[in-house]
């Protein structure tokens, strides 16, 4: 049955229904209005975007956005930089502190301090719209982090360790801020508060290198951009972003079309889902950059060879065991090259450069290499299925926050399973 053509009134009614499907709760909506008022007072002239709830908070296009159109333009006065922090009440404490503090710590302390000030903070409209917690591995319990793929699990543990060390090494500085605080410094600058602030900066900042400051150490490249940080990532979207020295604004120009009432997206970079989960706390559906990483240790479980340890040492020394992966198109060039090198007798290892140039290792060794990679993928598939069963079991008795984390890992593992099955099929063709 064909669709009846709608008149103008019918089209408007359908558009209103489309818009209303994504309404956010009244509390978030009021906080969004407060943020717009705050930014307006700092020179922001408005945008064609409003806060909506899709599968989470995002910005909806009030009108169609064309390719080449300015998506958002945020004045420098609306950005939170280290210069913003140095001009605040914290500035005098930071400037006199030795050894010098890192830019990332300074931004984190600023967020914690401004949240502590509540409505007295000039930035309260922004702080109140930030999430209360995040779904990065820094928030995962040991039981949850153990469900991550090995490569991501290691990086997640390193993320937690970095945070603990940052908090521990900053205690003296935190105590020096006591004259500014209403409550004891150890309560205000707790590990949980620093974790929240660190994840806020890590997941929501834009890349915008700052001029070197004599009061800070290390690179200063992260800037918080209120409103702009509500734009979500989609891998297939293209934008042009950067600070415009003429307008003195950070600008994002869309390179693709966004229909009216649809969510407006930007692109955080060509990241696979493991990187997105680690750095931003989410996974993207249909991510063309996603792969499954292969840990070199798996070769010890599969290959029976008296010279394997020597071969692995050689590959490690020449950086051939880094970034081994499987995509939906099959094993990566690096994975196949590593396995082909493992197929060679030790006496032939002087030929390794020829293998890198694509020289064949011989029909028998090529068949051995393909069988070995198939075994690797099958071993990874078995592990993926096992972990998915464990996740489903954990979901039955998880807390709300833990459930959110488990669902993300479940999505990651399901994608992993699809990639491995597809990669195995490619080898069988």
PLM regions and their residue ranges:
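Hydrophobic or amphipathic alpha-helical targeting/insertion segments
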Residues: 79-80, 96-100, 104-117
